[in-house]
Every structure is written in structure tokens, then in C-alpha cells.
Amino acid sequence: EFLAQDYDDIRMPVNALRFFVFNEKMKLELLAVPTFEGYKLPTDAENPWSVLPKNTALHLVWNEDGSSPKLHFSNKEYGGRLCFTLPGVDFSLAALHTWNKMPMISYRSSGNHMTVSPQYYRMGFFGGDISKPLGQFVLRGEAAFNVDKHFSYKPEAGAMEQKGFNTVNYLVGV
């Protein structure tokens, strides 16, 4: 398998509604995604990218039943972005109430097999970016704050209650 994405994967359609309001200095984009679609995870034991643990004594059973959020109005994803293009500086602010597309993997052993199930959790996102010309260079900065983002634990911790974490990512460059 190749590490680079195929062009078809990059241009994949998304079931979403987008609304724009803009003028020469400001743009507002609102987004609503009524359906959930998580990542397609490789679960075949022969696949080197498989998310299932290797060399286990128990037979592994992948079970996705009931793991995805149900198709309810309360489960939709929504967000917005407000961009400004002003003399000497561009900046934007964004927020998103979404589902983490990468599931937490839970492990439940019973008898001679272990059931492996994906679990999806809600998360929030707040972010912003800024661009400022400095002579022939442009100073650019971005920041993202993820609220209640869940990460996969070691398989031994799969039976424990999972909790979300708040994370901050940022980048500044010229």
C-alpha cells in the first residue's frame, strides 16, 4: 500500500450544507453535516496497517454494531468560520462541534475470543489563523484548541472508562 492518498480519496464528496455571506473584507461560512461517517479502518490481520493488536492469544472479533452515532438531529455536526481581509493583515476564527472521526478502540474478552469495537465520541474545536506581510516575507500563525478529544489507549486499558483531553496545537512561520 502507498502512503500517499489517491486523487479520488482527496476529492471525496461530503454530505454537508454550506452557507456563505461575504463582502470585500469579510466572509462568513456556516456548515452543517447531518450524517456521520468515521474513518474506514483496516481490520484485516494481513494488512500491515491493521488497527487490531498483533500476536494475541485470543481470537479477535471486529464488531461495529451500534458504534456509530444514530441518525438524529442532535447528532449532527455544525460549525462556522469568520474570515477578515483587512489592509495589512488577514485573519480568521473558526469553531466546530463534531464527532472524532478516529474511534477509540475498546476491547472486551469473553471465553476464547476478544471483541474489538470502535467507539466514537463528541469533540469541539476552536481555532484561528493570522497572516501579516513583513516586507518581502509573510508572518503566518495558526492555532487550534480541541475540546474533549479522545485518544486510543493501550489494549490493556481498553476496559477502562475513557476520557477526553483538551489539546492545543499551534504553528508560527515566515
Name each region found by the language model.
Residues 96-98, 136-174:
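Detector for outer-membrane/organellar transmembrane beta-barrel domains
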Residues 80-108:
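Membrane-embedded beta-barrel scaffold of Gram-negative outer-membrane proteins
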Residues 2-5, 64-68, 112-116, 153-162:
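Extracellular loop and loop/strand-boundary signature of outer-membrane beta-barrel proteins
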Residues 16-21, 80-84, 93, 128-132, ...:
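Residues on the lipid-exposed face of transmembrane beta-strands in outer-membrane beta-barrel proteins
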Residues 41-47, 104-111, 151-158:
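Outer-membrane beta-barrel translocator domains and adjoining extracellular loop/strand segments
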Residues 11-15, 22, 74-78, 122-126, ...:
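Residues that define the transmembrane beta-barrel architecture of outer-membrane proteins
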Residues 23-25, 32-38, 86, 95-101, ...:
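Transmembrane beta-strands of outer-membrane beta-barrel pores
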Residues 1-49, 87:
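Outer membrane beta-barrel
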